[in-house]
């Protein structure tokens, strides 16, 4: 039976270098290669729908011919991953690149055809770890393990940028104060470590997603933090001591605040983790200062 390997990783994470080690036994289908062949530019992003429709068809055809296939692309969209996997009948392996974004940015600058820091930061906002997607095996690959840090290191992000939430009346407290309040409450109530870690780090992505524009591009007075949970999840995932249960909570913690949560919850295989999300939401809401102005000391 044929074997299919899908890489997941942002630009500069070493996907292609790692995949090329297996070129003797697999047909490597590269999105960059297809872009250059079809449109003459590996950085072309204007034909993505057409491009991936062609790529997915070619992958399915190769597997139907009983050939082993490696799909080398960022593959950050869970929806697109699931769509392709549902059409493939073979052993399916995910290789997800566990490389800190700072390292990816540095590696990208060394490349002849750099995508740029802004593109990489946008990619992180779409990151999602492949829970319940149909893979038979998930391998975490870190070719730059010397740059990995324990998760506690990421608390230093609070000193790298303006800490104010700028979204009164929902938060008068700072971002770091909110996370500290959540963590303190979890420790006091003797929550398990996986849960306390999520409480401590769930909003670290806000330091990289703050904007004063809504999704329509209209300027707003209150700060927005669209997709911060995905950035938080990526930052935690690239720590050397990450675990998938904490990652699941961080990645999905905003779902309980939004419509459609119960419909999503019913589809999950691990209902204990879904209940963790429900409980997490209570901490997230309770550990805010919403009635009086908060002054930084």
Which functions belong to the PLM regions below?
Residues 90-104:
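Conserved phosphate-donor/acceptor-positioning beta-strand/loop module used by diverse small-molecule
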Residues 4-8, 103-150:
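Conserved GTP-binding G-domain of TRAFAC-class P-loop NTPases and closely related GTPase folds
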Residues 14:
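Conserved glycine(s) of the Walker
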Residues 71-81:
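Acidic, metal-coordinating catalytic cores used for nucleic-acid/nucleotide bond scission
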Residues 182, 186-292:
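Divalent metal-dependent catalytic cores for phosphoryl transfer on phosphate-bearing substrates
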Residues 17-67:
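Conserved substrate/cofactor phosphate-moiety recognition/catalytic segment
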Residues 1-5, 66-67:
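Pre-Walker A (Motif I) flank of P-loop NTPase domains
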Residues 151-183, 211-220:
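Active-site flanking loop/helix segments enriched in acidic
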